[in-house]
Design a protein with these regions (language model features):
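Short beta-alpha junctions and helix-cap segments that line functional grooves
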Residues: 117-119, 192-193, 263
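Cytosolic catalytic regions of ATP/NTP-dependent phosphoryl-transfer enzymes
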Residues: 13-28, 130-224, 242
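Hydrophobic alpha-helical transmembrane segments
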Residues: 1-130, 325-391
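Residues within well-ordered alpha-helices
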Residues: 179, 217, 236, 263-264
Length: 391
C-alpha cells in the first residue's frame, strides 16, 4: 500500500455520501491526502480484536482444562492436556485467515493504483449503495474520436460545423472535444444556443440563429420525424438536422478501454451496488452500452436529465471519512476498492467463524480427554490431522 502511494502522481479519495439517490448512499470521488490514509493505517480491525479476545479466552480455558486433568490424573496428565489444548484451541491457519485475504486484495489493488483506508474503509464501503458514472468513467479522454463526416443538403459544411459544435458545447460530455476538432478544421465559430433541450432518449435540440437544430442517434432522428436515407444509416454516428432536414452524419469511434470494461462488469456483478448513469453524451444509451461492453444493463439506472444535472452538482464532503484512495482516474481503480472491500469483509468474518468453531470443538474434545484420562489419544498424528481438518 505504501508503495502504491509512493508512486502516485495524482491522489483521489473515495467517500460515502448519505441519501444521495432515492434514500440510498452514493460513493463519490474527491481530492485525497496521504494523511487520510496514515490516520487509519495502523488501526486494529474488528476481526483482529475478536481474534485477540478469543485467543485470551482459549488460554484461560486451556489452563482450566489442564487443572481439571491435574486434579483427576496427576501433574503429567495436566502438562500433556495443557500443551495439546493450546494447539487445538487455535487452529494453525487461524493466524493467516485475516492477513492472507488482505494481502491478496492489496496486491490486486496495487495493480490498479488503489488503497483502502484501513478496516474503517472496508466496513463503510460494504452495504448497498449507488455508484455514479460519468462520461470519463465510461470513455476516458482520448478514446472518443472523429471517424469521418458526410454533409447533406444545401447548407455549407462550415455552417453545419458551427451549429453542431455549438449545440454539443451546450450539452457537454465526451463529444465536446470531437466536435471542437471538427469546428477547428472548418474554421467555424461557436454560436449562441437558445431553448436548449436534452430529450434523454438519445438526442438534444435547440434554436440557433432562429433555426431548430437536432442532434442524436439514428433512432432518435427517426422518432423525431427526420427523413434519413437508407444509405446513410450508421449505428455509431451523430445525426444532425437543421429545420427538420438531415444535414450531416458524423461517424464517431468509441474505443473500449480494458479498465472501463473491467470496472463496469465488476460493478454490475455486485448485487449490492447500483450503477447510476450521469453521462451527458446522448450517444451513451442503454442499448449502446450493453452492446459495447457486453453487459446486461437492467440493473443500470438512467435518470432523467434534470436529476442527472442535480446529482452531478453534488460533490464529496471534504469532512467525510475517506474510505479509499486512488492514484488513477479509471473506473476499475474505484470499483475494485468497493467490491474488494465486501469480499475482504466476508472472508475475514467467515475465517473467524470457522476457526473459532474449530477451536471450541477442540477444547470440548480436550475436556472429555481430561475427564476420562485417555492420554493415549494425544498422539502427534491425531493432532496433525485435527489441524489439517480446519485449514
Amino acid at each position: 500500500q505504501m508503495d502504491t502511494l509512493r508512486k502516485a502522481v495524482t491522489l483521489g479519495s473515495i467517500v460515502k455520501s448519505p441519501n444521495y439517490y432515492e434514500n440510498r448512499p452514493g460513493i463519490l470521488k474527491g481530492q485525497g491526502d496521504v494523511d487520510d490514509f496514515m490516520d487509519t493505517y495502523a488501526q486494529v480491525s474488528g476481526p483482529e480484536k475478536l481474534q485477540s479476545i478469543y485467543a485470551f479466552i482459549s488460554l484461560i480455558a486451556s489452563l482450566g482444562i489442564s487443572a481439571l486433568a491435574g486434579m483427576l490424573h496427576g501433574a503429567n496428565m495436566a502438562v500433556q492436556i495443557l500443551s495439546t489444548s493450546l494447539l487445538v484451541a487455535v487452529p494453525a491457519s487461524y493466524f493467516v485467515s485475516l492477513t492472507r485475504p488482505a494481502a491478496l486484495l492489496e496486491r490486486r489493488l496495487h495493480m490498479v493504483g488503489s488503497v483502502i483506508c484501513g478496516w474503517q474503509g472496508v466496513k463503510k464501503l460494504c452495504g448497498k449503495a449507488v455508484v455514479p458514472l460519468r462520461d470519463e468513467d465510461m470513455f476516458p479522454e482520448g478514446t472518443t474520436k472523429l471517424n469521418g463526416v458526410k454533409f447533406y443538403g444545401t447548407r455549407t459544411p462550415d455552417e453545419i460545423a458551427s451549429v453542431t459544435a455549438s449545440l454539443i458545447e451546450e450539452a457537454g460530455g465526451g463529444l465536446v472535444n470531437v466536435f471542437r476538432t471538427l469546428l477547428t478544421r472548418r474554421e467555424g465559430e461557436l454560436l449562441p444556443v437558445e431553448d436548449f433541450r436534452n430529450y434523454g432518449v438519445g438526442g438534444i435540440g435547440g434554436i440557433i440563429r432562429g433555426d431548430p437544430v437536432l442532434l442524436g442517434t439514428l433512432d432518435f432522428m427517426q422518432d423525431m420525424g427526420v427523413s434519413v436515407p437508407d444509405g446513410t444509416m450508421v449505428n455509431q454516428a451523430v445525426y444532425a438536422a437543421i429545420d427538420g432536414e438531415l444535414c450531416a452524419v458524423v461517424a464517431i469511434s468509441y474505443a473500449k478501454m480494458r479498465s472501463s470494461a473491467a470496472g463496469l462488469v465488476s460493478l454490475i456483478a455486485s448485487k449490492r451496488l447500483t450503477p447510476l448513469m450521469l453521462t451527458r453524451d446522448f450517444m451513451l444509451t442503454e442499448s449502446f452500452l450493453g452492446s459495447k461492453f457486453s453487459v446486461k444493463t437492467r440493473r443500470m439506472v438512467f435518470p432523467d436529465q434534470e436529476t442527472r444535472d442535480a446529482l452531478s452538482a453534488v460533490t464529496a464532503d471534504p469532512e467525510a471519512d475517506v474510505l479509499a484512495m486512488t492514484t488513477r482516474q479509471d473506473l476499475a481503480s474505484t470499483v475494485y476498492c468497493i467490491t474488494g472491500s465486501g469480499a475482504l469483509r466476508s472472508a475475514c468474518l467467515l475465517g473467524n467463524a470457522i476457526h473459532i468453531v474449530g477451536g471450541v470443538l477442540g477444547l470440548l474434545i480436550m475436556l472429555a480427554v481430561a475427564y476420562l484420562g485417555s492420554a493415549q489419544l494425544l498422539t502427534p498424528i491425531n493432532i496433525l490431522l485435527y489441524q489439517l481438518v480446519w485449514m
